[in-house]
Structure formats: C-alpha cells, structure tokens
C-alpha cells in the first residue's frame, strides 16, 4: 500500500458517507488478512456492504459530491457480487463491495460480531476470521483458497469448529481440504 495513513483516512471518510445512506461496512480483503496476521502485498482497501443497486447508485453520487472519483460497476446476472464502487484518489483505491441479494448474511453477521478495528477510535471494523474465511470460500479461486490456507496457518489458536460452523451455516463447501493443507503447513 503506497500510503496506509492516507487510505485509512479516506476509508474513514467513506464510512461517514455510508452512514448517510444508513449503511455500515466491514473491512474485508487484504487489509483484513493483515489484521489477522497474514500480510500480503495490496494496493487497495476493500469494504463489504449490503446495499441494493439503487443505493449503490446514490452512494456513488454522494461520493462524487464529497470530492471522490467514484465509478460503479453494476452486476450482471451471473455476477456473485451486488456491485462494486471503485473510489479513487491520491490515497489509492478503495473498493466498496456489495453482497446484497447475493450473500448478505455474511456481511450482516460480520458487522454484528466484529470487534477489531484498524486503529483505536476508528470506525473501520475488521471482519472476524470465520466470516473472512467464508467470504474467501464464496469468492472461490486459487488465490482465495491460498489466502485461507495462509490465514489458518498463521493463526494456530483459532477455533476451527467455529469456522466450520460458520461455513456450514452459509452452505459453503471446500473448507476441509483447506484445513488439511493448513495443518500440513503448520507442521513444517
């Protein structure tokens, strides 16, 4: 990340704009992975929300009115997401990713259960590990699976039963093979 302080300030400003639309967000993606002891290179900060398409459109307008460059990528019928707003500025790239009408329960639960913040006094809450694993399983693909393996390997004291329960609750498949791979990594 080019300037972590600048992107955090921008994300905190964006949270204020989200609240004006009665939305809340949870930090997901690489910043959440880093907060949970798995640091990998990233150039952006991702916020997970539950916002329908009309709200995403209105939010894009509000972001522009606040001086941000914001572009909404609307979902098509096959898209696993409910839309993505790219927020661009001197701070870098923020992405507001909606799971509304696709996978809203994981965001709702993460918002309710998140206790970790990016820094003291910040409104930026970090997705809990079980829900981060669920989001990565939902995303699928090699990179997301590799992220899960590394996340689990770097957090050996995790309650794996809780992660299994969360993933089962959302009817996500594929966790067991990743748990096996992670335990192999921890044994090395």
Positions of PLM-derived features:
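Compositionally biased terminal segments of proteins
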Residues: 1-188
């Amino acid at each position: 990340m080019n300037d972590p302080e600048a992107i955090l300030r921008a994300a905190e400003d964006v949270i204020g704009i989200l609240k004006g639309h009665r939305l809340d967000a949870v930090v997901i993606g690489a910043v959440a992975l880093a907060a949970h002891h798995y640091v990998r290179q990233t150039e952006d900060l991702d916020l997970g929300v539950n916002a329908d398409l009309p709200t995403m459109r209105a939010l894009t307008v509000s972001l522009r009115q606040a001086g941000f460059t914001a572009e909404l990528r609307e979902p098509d019928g096959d898209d696993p997401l409910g839309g993505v707003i790219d927020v661009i500025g001197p701070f870098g790239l923020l992405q507001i990713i909606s799971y509304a009408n696709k996978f809203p329960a994981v965001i709702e639960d993460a918002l309710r259960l998140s206790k970790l913040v990016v820094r003291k006094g910040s409104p930026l809450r970090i997705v809990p590990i079980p829900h981060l694993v669920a989001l990565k399983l939902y995303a699928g693909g090699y990179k997301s699976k590799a992220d899960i393996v590394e996340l689990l390997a770097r957090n050996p004291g995790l309650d794996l039963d809780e992660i299994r329960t969360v993933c089962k609750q959302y009817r996500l498949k594929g966790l067991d093979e990743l748990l096996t791979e992670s335990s192999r990594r921890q044994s090395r």
